[in-house]
Swiss-Prot record:
Function according to Swiss-Prot or TrEMBL: Xylan 1,4-beta-xylosidase involved in the hydrolysis of xylan, a major structural heterogeneous polysaccharide found in plant biomass representing the second most abundant polysaccharide in the biosphere, after cellulose. Active against rye arabinoxylan and xylohexaose, but not paranitrophenyl-beta-xyloside.
Gene Ontology CC: one annotated term: extracellular region
Name of the protein in its database record: Exo-1,4-beta-xylosidase bxlB
Intracellular or extracellular location(s): Secreted
Catalytic reaction annotation: Hydrolysis of (1->4)-beta-D-xylans, to remove successive D-xylose residues from the non-reducing termini
PANTHER family: BETA-D-XYLOSIDASE 5-RELATED (PTHR42721:SF3), SUGAR HYDROLASE-RELATED (PTHR42721)
Gene this protein is translated from: bxlB
Length: 763
């Protein structure tokens, strides 16, 4: 190891200085690289990549296995930073840089994924991703970014305490799967052989803990049953591989059933590449940042750096976000822990993806290479960001028509969020052109505005209460802007409580005693327990806005004033605050059991507000096109290479706006089959959804909801994915007053998939 570090010191010393911007595209015209087949566009991407890898020395190969790949000055291969982020817009992270002012000093900052998830609008997801990838390519063309992006995060948001739940679309695996299909499709484009950018599905697998009870994500061993893997943790990742053909995956920090994810050949090879067929020549796996190192230093799965590097490479990791592969693969090779063939295969996958992206091709003839500053933060993008903020807003309470607000008058804006800007963005964000505060948004609408924060997000001081109560007494209506921000929830920071932090709730309830119309706008990715506010007659309305980002002020006030009608739905369950005392975060089981009351709407019944909840400024009547559908033949539904994607039927609803306000309506369709499959059975399962746009008062709209086989299946502990014949009940929305419908699947039990088990699966 000492010998390896000495001959590689010069490269390593420059390799890991934080990059300010990306290197230029390779010179395939006049430079030394132009003499190599990598620049020959008549060859296949795989052939071109293999030719480059074969031209590299062992030292050069090893020094291109980290995220800050050194390239080869000898060959004219520029350095490349693989670590680029674009969770909800081009983000200021490592491989991405922003100017201090002028061109490329900002990008469109869309609302956080949890807000986009609350919109339940697949077309909206794709359009957002398309704009993000356009801006990403513009940044790349100006040497401010790369052309691969480590997004999306599709770990289902199972535990309300998880600090990174804000990065996900929500808790339901079908919802996450549909999100990722559209988001990856929007980022990469429609041609898998020539992607717009490379997307990266993360974090494989069973990752939803930062630090809890003295256990951190770096050493946590997630004990997960085969049933929960197949029904909950893996479906979004399977969609990434099978349906979306994502370009890259990221393995997670945690171990899965005893094996660190980035050292788990079963997970990365047997499941991902072989069982799911994710074997494209340009498909690659990166470790999460520092995850390869932590195979040794936190999991103690191996004893040395070379062993950790070898374990990752041999498991199927192609790239290290960190230093362990470039630091230790040389010694691993000398010890016989890796083969040159395995190293070459990893690099070939990486460079094949760059060839497919046009990285080595002339700019002429590549429309994407002409994108520039004029294509960033366009008026269309800004309007779309506002649309997402509006469509993802969820109305949780509205008594006596507290909302929409009356025009004009005096508003008292109270709460810690009234003057926030970047705090509205969530994490993994880049600079936005402008983020108006709630105060600014209200003043633009012509209101007379009185302001007093009253308290801070997590403060127990009541020093500001008197000022808040004083302005409230002078106002026509009160709006409290509060909730949680990234000082309470974020990467590396899980919550220990899920009630309102600090004394925000105390202040809200004091305001509620004044007899003025009071609206509470709740920010944050995770939910807080609103029980006291829902029960208070003095709290007229509650609105969840999540992290609405650059258009948050305008979008929120469009909803508050009635310019836009709320129609978003909670993409996660709102649990009572006592829930955190009932189940440890380290318990990965979904089903109820000892010290576990059950997780998500499928298994938990005592929610404060359920998954899918959301009110409107109008009323709707919903009925089924018919009371019974089908029957459907089980064997027919089980046909094909990927039967889980087969369509069962398109179920039609008649949705009538019986109120006075035009409004969108999200039709959520659940199925229940309590007698079928292993017991206990889920309470219900989301099987489809569709968002209808602007249904006018008095209008009846036909809303079609397509249902595939996947959400109807159940898994067994021996790894079978099964479709059971029998009767299924369809439920719409979370309104028990809406009628149900039924359908029947006839025939024999069908095994759709035989999932390979590792031998380490949790019982």
């Amino acid at each position: 190891m000492a010998v390896f570090k000495s001959w590689n010191l010069a490269l390593l010393s420059s390799l890991f200085i934080p990059a300010l911007c990306q290197s230029n595209y390779p010179d395939c015209t006049t430079g030394p690289l132009s003499e190599l087949p990598i620049c020959d566009t008549s060859l296949s991407p795989l052939e071109r990549a293999k030719s480059l890898v074969s031209a590299l020395t062992l030292e050069e190969k090893i020094n291109n296995t980290g995220h800050e790949a050194a390239g080869s000055s000898r060959l004219g291969l520029p350095a490349y930073n693989w670590w680029n982020e674009a969770l909800h817009g081009v983000a200021e992270k490592h491989g991405v840089s922003f100017e201090e002012s002028g061109d490329f000093s900002y990008a469109t900052s869309f609302p956080a994924p949890i807000v986009l998830g609350a919109a339940f609008n697949d077309a909206l997801i794709r359009r957002v991703a398309e704009i993000i990838s356009t801006e990403a390519r513009a940044f790349s063309n100006s040497d401010h970014a790369g052309i691969d992006y480590w997004t999306p995060n599709v770990n289902p948001f199972k535990d309300p305490r998880w600090g990174r739940g804000q990065e996900t679309p929500g808790e339901d695996p079908l919802h996450c799967s549909r999100y990722v299909k559209e988001f990856v499709g929007g980022l990469q484009g429609d041609d898998p052989e020539k992607p717009k950018v490379v997307a990266t599905c993360k974090h494989l697998a069973a990752y939803d803990l930062e630090e809890w009870g003295g256990v951190s994500r770096f050493e946590f061993d997630a004990k997960v049953s085969a049933v929960d893997l197949l029904e909950y943790y893996l479906p979004p990742f399977k969609t990434c591989a099978v349906d979306a053909s994502v370009g890259a995956f990221m393995c997670s920090y945690n171990a899965l059933n005893g094996v660190p994810a980035c050292a788990d050949r079963y997970l990365l090879q047997t499941v991902l590449r072989e069982h799911w067929g994710w074997e494209g020549p340009g498909h690659w796996v990166t470790g999460d940042c520092g995850a390869v190192e932590r195979i040794q230093t936190y999991h103690h799965y191996v004893e040395s750096g070379p062993e950790a590097a070898a374990a990752a490479l041999n498991a199927g990791v192609d790239l290290d976000c960190g230093t362990w592969l470039p630091s230790y693969l040389g010694e691993a090779e000398r010890q016989g822990l890796i083969s040159n063939e395995t190293l070459d295969a990893a690099l070939t996958r990486l460079y094949t993806s760059l060839v497919q992206l046009g990285y080595f091709d002339p700019a002429e003839g590549q429309p994407l290479r002409s994108l520039g500053w004029d294509d960033v933060a366009t008026s269309e993008a800004e309007e779309l960001a506002k649309t997402v903020a509006i469509q993802g807003t969820v109305l949780l309470k509205n008594i006596d028509w507290t909302l929409p607000l009356k025009a004009n008058g005096t508003l008292a804006l109270i709460g810690p969020f009234i003057n926030f800007t970047t705090e509205l963005q969530s994490n993994y964000a880049g600079p936005a052109k402008h983020i108006p505060t709630m105060i600014e948004a209200a003043e633009r609408l012509g209101y007379n505005v009185l302001t007093a924060p009253g308290t801070e997000v997590n403060s127990t001081s009541t020093d500001g209460f008197d000022d808040a109560l004083a302005i409230a007494a002078e106002a026509d209506a009160l709006i409290f802007f509060g909730g949680i921000d990234n000082t309470v929830e974020e990467e590396s920071l899980d919550r220990t409580r899920i009630d309102w932090p600090g004394n925000q709730e105390e202040l809200i309830l004091e305001l509620a005693e004044l007899g003025r119309p009071l609206t509470v706008v709740q920010f944050g990715g995770g939910q807080v327990d609103d029980s006291a506010l829902l029960a208070s007659a003095g709290v007229g309305a509650i609105v969840w806005a999540g992290y609405p980002s650059q258009a948050g002020g305008a979008g929120v006030f469009d909803v508050l004033t009635g310019k836009a009608a709320p129609a978003g739905r909670l993409p996660i369950t709102q649990y009572p605050k006592s829930y955190v005392d009932e189940v440890p975060m380290t318990d990965m089981n979904l089903q109820p059991g000892t010290d576990n009351p059950g997780r998500t709407y499928r298994w938990y019944e005592d929610a404060v507000l359920p998954f899918g909840f959301g009110l409107h400024y109008t009323t709707f009547n919903v009925s089924w096109a018919k009371k019974a559908f089908g029957p459907y033949d089980a064997a027919t539904l089980a046909r094909g290479k990927n039967p889980s994607s087969n369509i069962v039927d398109t179920f039609s609803l008649a949705v009538t706006n019986t109120g006075d306000v035009a409004s969108d309506y999200v039709a959520l369709v659940f199925a229940s089959a309590p007698e079928l499959g292993a017991q206990p059975a889920p309470i219900k399962t989301l099987v489809g959804y569709s968002r209808a746009s602007l249904i006018k008062p008095g209008e009846t709209r036909k809303v079609d909801v397509e249902v595939t086989v996947a959400p109807l299946t159940r898994a067994t502990e021996d790894g079978r994915v099964v479709l059971y014949p029998g009767e299924y009940t369809l439920l719409v929305d979370v309104n028990d007053e809406y009628p149900t419908a039924k359908f029947e699947i006839k025939g024999d039990v069908q095994v759709l998939e035989k999932f390979p088990l590792s031998g380490n699966d949790s019982d």
